């Protein structure tokens, strides 16, 4: 739409009896009857190519640092910039003249930071009878220069550059087959990897009230997660939180390379002060970028924060279209839309045999921490793991504040799941005894029950809680988790010859401290094994054979 000489981007969201309803991705002040409208005939799309990593985009894929240079502090409407940096790349061809190609096939590669960036045939190319007519030799070329020409049996020719365009609401399906997500995505957070695992190519959601630690948890997953690329979609979060992400991510050190985490990260931010429709687009933009890097054989982790704001954007658009409202005025198709977004996650086998994945983790911000509201319920039906943060645990400073009893996961973890279930049953029984003790007090509780309660508290404090600001305890490798859980499991399963409550409390307090000291030792160092031996000797001194 042309308004005051500026072209505002919009998307047609409904056509009814010759009347098109348009959603504008900018502030729509000043639009009047008679303003000219241009139809491009294209779907809402993003540009994909080398140079996307390290960038910060808005929901429409405008690079925000470049926009800031051009517009100053406040973004002007109608300003759109190229998302792909204007530069040359060192291209190496991987096909030759006469080779058959189809959608999603690689025609060459360029080095991008830590990765080899595959240059691919557009995913939207139709037909399988295309052949390479000409391809450039190895050398340095501009990102938008033609590097390959392909033609089909009808004589149609298509010029290809390093940049391809992909509609954001169409999933990329250029792969051999989808696989079952069975390999754990290691986050090095004990409570997630052992008790509530996430799989590569799986989905998980993190609902929780404000201030429960969702953002720090996301930082830890981004920093220590076993993913090649991390994409953060901050859609509709408060501007303050987005600023925090933008400030902290470049400072976070990537433990794998020792360089900045930003080198393998893309951030897409649409704060709650930006227009509503662009907020809806930002989730789809993020997942399209994730699928693009998946096609190169990489494992991608997409963190969407927060899907509640995205659903609220849908609610506003649905209201303007005068559609029949569902529960809490959300549209009736809320569930299917959320499901279609999470279904774009997955582990796939590509045509060249590589296994790659997109893992989607969405945070949900239910009003007042009420998990019964429609967005949380619709999300729970489609995700494979639920990490519910609780206000009660964050107030008690038990971090990460994932509630071990309310949360669940359908995936397999890094520790033997049968043992984890036994440990979880101790946690449940300990919690029941704790509830009973609040009524009858310690005096009315038997020594046996009191020991079970203390075992539950021990498991919670030494294994489920983790200090993300401690250089050693912040990241706990799978081997270390198995080792520590093995010792803790034996201590939990042992029977203790203790009758006096004060003696029981003193014993478990000391055992807890020994475990916490163990967390501070370097894995497989002499101190690590010495502390392990000390713990075993200490609990066996009171255990009954």
Predicted segments, located by residue:
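A structural micro-motif recognizing beta-strand termini
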Residues: 3, 15-16, 22-28, 41-42, ...
């Amino acid at each position: 739409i042309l308004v005051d000489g500026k072209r505002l981007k919009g998307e047609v969201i409904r056509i009814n009896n010759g009347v098109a309803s348009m959603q504008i991705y900018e502030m729509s002040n000043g639009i009047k009857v008679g303003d000219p409208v241009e139809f491009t005939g294209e779907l809402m799309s993003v540009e994909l190519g080398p140079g996307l990593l390290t960038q910060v985009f808005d929901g429409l894929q405008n690079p925000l640092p470049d926009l800031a240079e051009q517009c100053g502090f406040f973004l002007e409407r109608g300003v759109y910039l190229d998302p792909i940096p204007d530069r040359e790349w060192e291209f190496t061809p991987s096909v030759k003249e006469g080779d058959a190609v189809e959608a999603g096939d690689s025609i060459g590669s360029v080095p991008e930071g830590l990765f080899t960036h595959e240059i691919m045939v557009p995913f939207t190319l139709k037909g399988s009878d295309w052949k390479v007519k000409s391809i450039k030799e190895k050398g340095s070329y501009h990102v938008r220069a033609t590097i390959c020409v392909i033609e089909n049996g009808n004589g149609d020719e298509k010029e290809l550059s390093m940049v391809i365009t992909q509609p954001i609401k169409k999933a990329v399906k250029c792969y051999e087959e989808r696989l079952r997500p069975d390999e754990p995505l290691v986050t090095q957070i004990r409570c997630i990897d052992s008790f509530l695992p996430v799989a590569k190519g799986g989905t998980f959601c993190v609902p929780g009230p404000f201030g429960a630690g969702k953002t720090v948890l996301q930082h830890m997953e981004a920093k220590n997660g076993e993913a090649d690329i991390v994409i953060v979609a901050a859609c509709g979060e408060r501007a303050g939180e987005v600023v925090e992400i933008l400030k902290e991510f470049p400072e976070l050190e990537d433990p794998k390379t020792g360089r900045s985490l930003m080198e393998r990260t893309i951030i897409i931010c649409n704060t709650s002060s930006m227009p509503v429709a662009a907020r809806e687009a930002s989730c789809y933009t993020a997942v399209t970028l994730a699928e693009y890097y998946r096609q190169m054989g990489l494992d991608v982790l997409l963190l969407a924060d927060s899907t509640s704001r995205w659903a609220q954007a849908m609610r506003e658009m649905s209201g303007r279209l005068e559609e029949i409202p569902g529960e809490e005025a959300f549209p009736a198709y809320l569930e299917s839309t959320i499901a279609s977004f999470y279904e774009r996650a997955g582990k796939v086998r590509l045509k060249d045999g590589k296994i790659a994945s997109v893992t989607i983790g969405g945070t949900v911000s239910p009003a007042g921490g009420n998990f019964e509201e429609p967005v949380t319920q619709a999300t729970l039906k489609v995700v494979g793991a639920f990490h519910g943060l609780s206000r009660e645990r964050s107030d008690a400073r038990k971090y990460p504040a994932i509630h071990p009893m309310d949360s669940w996961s359908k995936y397999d973890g890094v520790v033997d799941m049968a043992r984890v279930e036994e440990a979880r049953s101790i946690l449940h029984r300990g919690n029941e005894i704790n509830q009973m003790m609040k009524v009858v007090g310690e005096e009315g509780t038997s020594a046996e029950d009191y020991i079970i309660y203390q075992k539950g508290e021990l498991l919670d404090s030494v294994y489920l809680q983790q200090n993300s600001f401690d250089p050693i305890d912040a990241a706990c490798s799978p081997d270390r988790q198995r080792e520590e859980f093995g010792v803790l499991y034996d201590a939990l399963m042992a029977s203790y010859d203790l009758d006096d409550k004060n003696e029981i409390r003193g014993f478990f307090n000391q055992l807890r401290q020994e475990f916490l000291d163990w967390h501070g030792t370097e894995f497989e160092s002499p101190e690590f094994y010495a502390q392990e031996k000390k713990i075993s000797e200490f609990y066996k001194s009171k255990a009954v054979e």
